[in-house]
C-alpha cells in the first residue's frame, strides 16, 4: 500500500470505553476488552473472527487485560469504512488511534497472518505503541510465498486473484473458501470454525485486503522494529512443503529484524492456535513473561 494514499483515508474514531469488559467501536475495527492486568492486543487474520482468540483469551484473562480486535468486513462484521478503497493501512491507523485514545502503555501485540503483518506495520510506524510483538504464521512480504522477489513481481498475480475473487458468485465464493480452509486448519473443529468465518466475510473486503497483503513489503523497514519479536510458524508434512524449505523462508524474510526469536510449531497448518492450542498457549506464556 502506498503511504501517499493514507491522507485520503483518514478515519474519524468514536470510542465507547468502559472500566470492565466492553466493546470499543470505530468504523474500521471493533475491540472487545476482557480481563485485568497488563495490556495485550490480539489481531486476527484475513477473513477471520476475533473468536479465533477465544481459547487464548480464556487462558490469559485472569492475568492480562485483553483487547481483542475484529476487523470490519471479516467474519460477518459489517464492512463500514472498509467497504471501499484500501483496508490494511487504515486498520493499522485505527489500532494506533485505539491505543492512544485509551492511553495504553506499550501493550504487547499478538497478530495472526494478516494480523501479524499489521502488527509489524504498527511496530515500525508507531514504536511507542508496541512493547513486544508476536507474529503468528505470517511473513513481512506475502509475495515471497509465490516466489516473488518484490511487490512489482507479484502485482500481476495479486491482481488476477483479487479480480477472480470479486467476480465469483456468493455460492462459488463459499464453495472455494470451504475447500481452501482445509489447507489452513488441520483440526476438523478448527477447519469448521475458520470456514464459517471466511464464508461470512465480505467478499470485496477480503479481495482487496488479500491484494494489499500480497503487494505490501515491510522487509526494508524491519530494522526499525527494536521491540522483542517472537515469530511462530507452522509446519506439517501433509502440506507437502519440506521442512528444509519452510525454516529458511522465515529466517530469510525476517533477516533484517534485529531482536527476534523464530519458533517452528510442528503438526500444524496455518491456524496454529486451533490446530495446536497447547503448544500455542505455551509459546504465548513465554512471550508474555
Language model features with spans:
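Post-His helix in hydrolase/transferase enzymes
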Residues: 274-286
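Catalytic histidine-centered segment of alpha/beta-hydrolase-like enzymes
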Residues: 265-277
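Conserved HGGG/HGGXW glycine-rich cap/lid loop of the alpha/beta-hydrolase fold
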Residues: 32-80
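Flexible "cap/lid" loop of the alpha/beta hydrolase fold
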Residues: 124, 131-168
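Active-site loop/oxyanion-hole signature of alpha/beta-hydrolase fold enzymes
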Residues: 34, 67-110, 114
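Conserved alpha/beta-hydrolase catalytic His-Asp/Glu region
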Residues: 145, 149-150, 166-223
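Conserved loop-alpha-helix segment in the C-terminal half of the alpha/beta-hydrolase fold
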Residues: 228-268
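Hydrolases whose catalytic domains are alpha/beta-hydrolase-1, hotdog thioesterase
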Residues: 118-122
Amino acid at each position: 500500500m502506498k503511504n501517499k494514499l493514507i491522507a485520503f483515508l483518514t478515519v474519524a474514531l468514536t470510542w465507547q470505553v468502559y472500566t470492565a469488559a466492553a466493546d470499543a467501536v470505530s468504523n474500521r475495527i471493533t475491540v472487545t476488552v476482557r480481563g485485568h492486568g497488563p495490556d495485550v492486543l490480539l489481531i486476527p487474520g484475513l477473513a477471520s473472527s476475533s473468536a479465533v482468540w477465544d481459547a487464548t483469551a480464556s487462558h490469559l484473562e485472569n492475568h492480562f487485560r485483553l483487547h481483542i480486535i475484529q476487523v470490519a468486513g471479516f467474519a460477518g462484521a459489517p464492512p463500514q469504512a472498509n467497504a471501499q478503497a484500501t483496508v490494511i493501512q487504515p486498520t493499522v491507523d485505527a489500532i494506533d488511534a485505539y491505543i492512544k485514545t485509551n492511553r495504553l502503555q506499550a501493550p504487547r501485540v499478538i497478530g495472526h497472518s494478516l494480523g501479524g503483518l499489521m502488527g509489524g506495520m504498527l511496530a515500525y510506524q508507531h514504536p511507542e505503541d508496541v512493547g513486544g510483538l508476536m507474529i503468528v504464521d505470517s511473513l513481512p512480504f506475502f509475495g515471497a510465498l509465490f516466489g516473488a522477489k518484490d511487490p512489482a513481481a507479484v502485482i500481476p498475480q495479486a491482481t488476477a486473484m483479487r479480480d477472480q475473487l470479486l467476480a465469483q458468485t456468493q455460492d462459488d465464493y463459499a464453495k472455494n473458501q470451504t475447500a481452501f480452509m482445509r489447507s489452513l486448519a488441520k483440526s476438523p473443529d478448527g477447519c469448521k470454525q475458520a470456514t464459517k468465518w471466511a464464508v461470512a466475510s465480505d467478499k470485496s473486503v477480503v479481495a482487496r485486503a488479500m491484494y494489499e497483503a500480497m503487494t505490501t513489503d515491510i522487509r526494508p523497514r524491519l530494522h526499525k522494529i527494536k521491540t522483542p519479536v517472537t515469530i511462530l510458524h507452522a509446519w506439517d508434512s501433509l502440506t507437502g512443503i519440506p521442512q528444509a524449505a519452510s525454516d529458511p523462508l522465515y529466517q530469510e524474510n525476517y533477516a533484517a529484524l534485529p531482536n527476534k526469536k523464530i519458533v517452528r510449531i510442528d503438526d500444524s497448518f496455518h491456524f496454529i492456535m486451533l490446530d495446536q492450542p497447547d503448544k500455542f498457549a505455551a509459546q504465548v506464556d513465554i512471550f508474555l513473561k
